[in-house]
């Protein structure tokens, strides 16, 4: 591993050699470059290799960890910059010669010409410095300063490039340089007024799989830090030509002229790397990817038709919201009550305009009145679970964005701390929303059937053939429009919202291929081998599938055959789900849960674990089923005449249930601590957690909600039923859709790498993320979610949509009862 990284240092040196400030006695002549692209000459590799062979012979460094190596390396690299400043014509001449070698590569003539202009400007700068040394007349000083100022931009090119940063020993592979310095370079290069403009390019260099650093990371904290570089007991995998793709061995920023394409820069880097590998006699770099970011007309938002459509949609929405709010405040609210009930105010166009009123929509969201016949504790469960998810995603997106300069030691030490199991097990929070989803929808069904007046048949019937198709339709139509708008903004407007060395379009590539799988809620099955679109929405796919298959099955069984059969079927489905999970994890050697351990090799498994286990509905269905069971029990154990849902239980029963629930909850969250800390787990404990980990959490949460709803929750109910959670709960669906986008924008917009420090640091970032996500979700709900729901009610109200030809009606479950959010 040390040798591999050392080679990358050499590659950087070659790049700096080629493009640093230079000098030559030659005159710069653009006619030297023909449009014909020549084949690569291997003699260039040998020539360049000899340069570095001489350098290596002068260095005592054998490892990347040797600081003397870096001192020699940067002294050598800085010599080119100093050569221009000190007027070293011989060194500048050598730089021009090296640039001329680029003519032999598959590089565009415009790029080579600008590279030569850079080198020749260095020659001119050095020449003026040399001339000024021999000038005794003070009158030549102003002229020298003018010429020096005109050519001083070449040092910005050098300064903008990546340098070896601090933290090399802790795996800092982000040598990003200065994006802003490079982008500011804009100088006239000839009499025709053509310009030399800087563009920032980030090179990603991948190692071979045989040099997989994860082989060493598990034990790198013991013994000398370089022991694995010479330890003969460490056996590399066969050189099968595969690249180590989990993360790059180096990300290196270079400043290039904007005439160079990604391909051009890749060719120059490949030349440098091949030269370095030729010098040491081994191949260490498997692949080089380059992404250059230059402002071009074709990249402008005005040239993106879909982005312009999204922009016009946003503008139109702002206009509608403004007009609807003003009309509501100054016309409707001041009109007498009898006029409000008139046909004029009930005209479809007026209703359409008022659907966008921030005043009315905001009042509805902020309304925090509680109802004794509702499950008030679910508001707190929903919001706190969303905070838990944001906490986990804060860590996840910082880590997976590969913008952290101390990622390796953080990943090694993170799972060893007991309190961090709360973050490691954050995926359990998703189970909270599966539970809420099943419980709320089932509760509404059971309430309207089991608590119906005997003298008046219930409007809602689980056995009516119209009920379930319309239930599916209403669920789809209430969720999908908001989902589509978030997706549209994500792949268009959010692409242009920021910039920087790490910035990239967040979901454009994945959504351009897989968007349709999201709209049919099968993105947890289809195109799993490709980049997904809004990967966090796998939850919506699972949730929709649960409502299509499990909801009618269990509701009908409970209503037709009663509690015993319903509980028996529910238990059987949960046992079958756990058994399937156990079989898959044992066959493929997956961990019992998607957690990080001290042995980082587990990262290899988590990607396949995602596809085979994490997003599969037949494995994630347990909390949804438990939610339906709790909903049935709440309705079965209360009477229609009750004004609330209180159930009197014996004190001993309540204490036993709370103790059991606490044990189950702690087991589900902290039960794999030793596995996370050491990377080792006994087979019995692994099987036990695989089978009971998820059901334990679902049962614990089920008791908490049941106890709080029936009056046995005590202070827990007081906290979860806090009125402040009510409005926050209402916008959690939008917060769920938007918060990963906010986190990615934040992580990818930084000009410099992120540095992990303490747990408190991440708590602060999480609080900021929660605040930002819910603030944006509030306005997004005002502008899109609430208006779309009201328009849906206008177009497809229950009487028009549900009346059959025989006059029977089926009342749909209200939106706030069927939709929940992750």
Swiss-Prot record:
Cell location: Membrane
GO terms under biological process: lipid transport
Residues of this chain annotated as glycosylated in UniProt: 236
UniProt entry tagged with the keyword Transmembrane helix: yes
Residues annotated as signal peptide: 1-24
Positions in coiled-coil regions: none
GO molecular function, one term: lipid binding
PANTHER family (alphabetical): NOSE RESISTANT TO FLUOXETINE PROTEIN 6 (PTHR11161:SF65), O-ACYLTRANSFERASE (PTHR11161)
Name of the protein in question: Nose resistant to fluoxetine protein 6
Upper taxonomic lineage: Eukaryota, Metazoa, Ecdysozoa, Nematoda, Chromadorea
């Amino acid at each position: 591993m040390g040798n591999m990284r050392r080679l990358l240092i050499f590659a950087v040196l070659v790049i700096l050699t080629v493009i640093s400030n230079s000098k030559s006695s030659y005159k710069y002549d653009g006619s030297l470059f023909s449009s014909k692209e020549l084949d690569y000459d291997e003699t260039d590799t040998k020539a360049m290799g000899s340069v570095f062979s001489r350098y290596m012979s002068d260095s005592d460094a054998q490892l990347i960890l040797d600081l003397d190596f870096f001192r020699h390396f940067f002294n050598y690299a800085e010599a080119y910059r100093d050569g221009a400043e000190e007027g070293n014509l011989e060194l500048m001449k050598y730089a021009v010669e090296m640039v001329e070698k680029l003519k032999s590569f598959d590089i565009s003539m415009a790029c080579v010409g600008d590279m030569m202009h850079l080198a020749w400007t260095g020659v001119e700068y050095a020449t003026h410095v040399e001339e000024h040394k021999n000038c005794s007349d003070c009158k030549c000083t102003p002229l020298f300063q003018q010429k020096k100022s005109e050519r001083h931009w070449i040092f910005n090119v050098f300064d903008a490039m990546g340098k070896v940063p601090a933290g090399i020993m802790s795996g800092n592979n982000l040598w990003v340089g200065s994006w802003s310095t490079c982008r500011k370079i804009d100088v006239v290069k000839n009499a025709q007024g053509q310009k030399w403009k800087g563009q920032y390019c980030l090179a990603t260099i991948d190692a071979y799989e045989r040099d997989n650093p994860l082989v060493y990371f598990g034990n790198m904290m013991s013994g000398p830090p370089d022991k694995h570089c010479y330890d003969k007991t460490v056996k590399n995998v066969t050189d099968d030509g595969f690249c180590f793709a989990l993360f790059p061995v180096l990300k290196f920023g270079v400043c290039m002229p904007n005439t160079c394409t990604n391909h051009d820069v890749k060719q120059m880097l490949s030349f440098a790397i091949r030269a370095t590998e030729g010098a040491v006699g081994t191949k260490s770099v498997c692949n080089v990817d380059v992404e250059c970011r230059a402002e071009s007309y074709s990249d402008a938002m005005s040239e993106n038709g879909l982005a312009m459509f999204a922009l016009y949609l946003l503008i139109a929405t702002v206009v509608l919201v403004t007009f609807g709010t003003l009309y509501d405040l100054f016309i409707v609210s001041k009109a007498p009550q009898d006029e409000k009930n008139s046909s004029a105010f009930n005209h479809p166009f007026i209703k359409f305009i008022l659907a966008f009123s921030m005043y009315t929509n905001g009042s509805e969201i902020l309304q925090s009145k509680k109802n004794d016949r509702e499950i008030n504790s679910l508001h707190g469960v929903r919001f706190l679970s969303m905070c838990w998810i944001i906490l986990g995603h804060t860590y996840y997106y910082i880590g997976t964005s590969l913008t952290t300069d101390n990622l390796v030691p953080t990943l090694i030490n993170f799972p060893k701390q007991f309190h961090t199991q709360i973050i490691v097990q954050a995926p359990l929070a998703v189970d909270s929303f599966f539970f809420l989803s099943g419980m709320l929808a089932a509760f509404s069904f059971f309430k309207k059937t089991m608590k119906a007046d005997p003298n008046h048949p219930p409007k809602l019937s689980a056995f009516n053939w119209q009920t379930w198709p319309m239930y599916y339709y209403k669920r789809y139509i209430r969720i999908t429009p908001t989902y589509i708008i978030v997706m549209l903004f994500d792949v268009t407007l959010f692409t242009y919202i920021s910039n920087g060395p790490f910035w990239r379009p967040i979901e454009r590539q994945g959504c351009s291929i897989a968007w349709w799988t999201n709209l049919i809620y099968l993105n947890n099955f289809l195109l799993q081998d490709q980049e997904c679109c809004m990967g966090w929405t796998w939850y919506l796919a699972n949730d929709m599938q649960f409502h299509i298959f499990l909801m009618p099955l269990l509701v009908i069984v409970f209503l037709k055959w009663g509690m015993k059969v319903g509980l028996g079927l529910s238990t059987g489905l949960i046992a079958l789900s756990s058994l399937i999970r156990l079989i898959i994890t044992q066959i493929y050697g997956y961990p019992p849960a998607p957690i990080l351990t001290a042995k980082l090799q587990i990262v290899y498994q988590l990607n396949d674990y995602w596809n085979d286990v994490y997003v599969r509905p037949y494995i994630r269905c347990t909390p949804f089923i438990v939610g339906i069971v709790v909903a049935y029990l709440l309705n079965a154990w209360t009477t229609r005449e009750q004004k609330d849902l209180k159930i009197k239980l014996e004190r001993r029963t309540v204490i036993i249930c709370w103790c059991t629930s606490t044990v189950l909850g702690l087991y589900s969250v902290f039960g794999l601590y030793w596995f996370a800390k050491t990377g080792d787990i006994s087979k019995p404990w692994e099987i036990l957690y695989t089978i009971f980990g998820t059901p334990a959490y679902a049962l614990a949460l089920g008791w908490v909600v049941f106890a709080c709803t029936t009056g046995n929750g005590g202070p827990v109910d007081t906290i979860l039923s806090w009125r402040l959670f009510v409005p926050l709960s209402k916008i959690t669906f939008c917060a769920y859709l938007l918060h990963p986008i906010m986190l990615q924008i934040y992580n990818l917009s930084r000009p410099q790498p992120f540095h992990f420090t303490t747990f408190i640091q991440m708590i602060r970032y999480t609080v900021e993320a929660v605040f930002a996500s819910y603030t944006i979700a509030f306005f997004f709900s005002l502008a899109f979610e609430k208006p779309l729901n009201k328009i849906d009610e206008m177009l497809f109200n229950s009487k028009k949509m549900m009346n059959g030809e025989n006059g029977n009606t089926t009342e749909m479950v209200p939106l706030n009862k069927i939709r929940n959010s992750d």
